[in-house]
Design a protein with these regions (language model features):
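A structural signal for short, hydrophobic/glycine-enriched beta-strand patches
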Residues: 1-143, 149
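A transmembrane-helix-recognition feature enriched in membrane-embedded lipid enzymes
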Residues: 148-159
Length: 159
């Protein structure tokens, strides 16, 4: 799993997927960075009192991460906001390990580089396995394909 041979000042875990959390935890525990940063991700329509970052902080502490090594950004709604919030929170860190889905990495990496970070990409949550063979079933309507379309549109508009 830990195929990354580089080290960063911080490991930043984007929100929205448990693979990101577990990937970030594994990198931190392997000594790849000195800080673990979670997002204060919270959508305006979400009435929960806690952000995902606050919940993940609790899980990280219960898994042996010292609380002083964990940072949480202010509330953010999208990846562009995340990059700015991370820069404000850990401005002294120049090199980060960005943990996000393989599908989302290209855009996320560009946004963090725009904020001045040197980004080491750590991709999780791959959507394909091995060789992808197209069959007639790929051309039929399905709820799964609708979900893939939604993911693509969200990536294009930056949500």
């Amino acid at each position: 799993m830990l195929e990354i041979n580089e080290f960063g000042d911080s490991t930043y875990v984007e929100w929205g997927d448990p693979d990101r959390f577990f990937g970030g935890m594994a990198l931190f525990k392997a000594g790849k960075a000195q800080k673990l940063v979670f997002t204060g991700g919270k959508m305006p329509w979400n009435k929960a009192k806690k952000t995902e970052g606050e919940v993940l902080r609790k899980y990280a502490i219960s898994n042996g991460i010292a609380s002083e090594k964990i940072y949480i950004t202010k509330d953010v709604e999208n990846t562009a906001d995340e990059a700015v919030a991370v820069k404000e929170l850990i401005s002294q860190s120049k090199r980060i390990i960005l943990v996000t889905s393989a599908f989302h990495m290209y855009r996320a990496k560009r946004l963090f580089e725009k904020e001045g970070f040197e980004v080491i990409a750590y991709k999780v949550d791959y959507k394909t396995e091995g060789e992808n063979v197209t069959t007639i079933m790929d051309f039929l309507s399905s709820s799964g394909n609708l979900a893939k379309t939604e993911s693509g549109i969200r990536e294009i508009i930056g949500r």
